A protein has these predicted regions:
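Cysteine-dependent hydrolase recognition
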Residues: 1-190
Length: 190
């Protein structure tokens, strides 16, 4: 999906060429990160990796939901309050932080890395647009765009996330109130 052009490309057939590289190319998860793996993350991995069962048979999962960090702008405090309260009522540790208090893209990435290794971070919700909470601008064959998931590429040199990242993309308080209301309606009455 290209959010700038608002186009979704669906491929019915794709050809890949695998190129072997020189040197050590293993990209293993550290033992500590596997011990923090939640059932939700294991489910995502099982859809990506053929040998994901070998990981789940060797390590126990944490029983808690993990921790959510919401990165936002202070203008959304009131609009996000019902969403934050709902997560807390569901027993999910939830912390709200402001992008301006953390700093730029690298500071946010460092903050999230620290949360991942030391606080059990499993989910990040970015609330607001790129002007309020910045994301890395990346280029690939499809063009250039913002990469929220790049915040979750902590271990190794791959593009597989260590935690989930999502964005409540809104440009003003009214839009955020609407998004939160719809989210809660669905969460409470699916």
């Amino acid at each position: 999906y290209n959010p700038v052009q608002r186009k979704l490309r669906v491929y019915s057939s794709i050809t890949l060429r695998v190129i072997e590289v020189e040197g050590d190319s293993e990209n293993k998860l550290s033992e500590g990160s596997i011990a923090r793996m939640t059932p939700e993350l294991n489910d995502a991995f099982s859809r990506r990796f053929i040998n994901s069962q070998s990981i789940s048979s060797r390590y126990d999962y944490i029983e808690e939901h993990g921790k959510i960090v919401v990165i936002t702008d202070p203008i959304y405090d009131v609009a996000l309050a019902p969403f934050i309260q709902w997560k807390i009522e569901k027993g999910i540790e939830t912390e709200v932080v402001y992008a301006d208090d953390i700093g730029g893209i690298n500071a946010i990435k460092n903050f999230l890395e620290d949360q991942y290794y030391n606080e059990g971070l499993t989910h990040v919700i970015i609330a607001g647009d790129e002007d309020q909470v910045p994301s890395e601008l990346v280029s690939n064959s499809g063009g250039t765009g913002y990469c929220d998931p790049c915040y979750s590429y902590i271990e190794g040199n791959d593009s597989y996330p260590e935690f989930f990242v999502g964005r409540l993309l809104t440009h003003n308080v009214s839009e955020m109130e609407s998004v939160v209301e719809r989210h809660l309606d669905y969460a409470k009455n699916p």
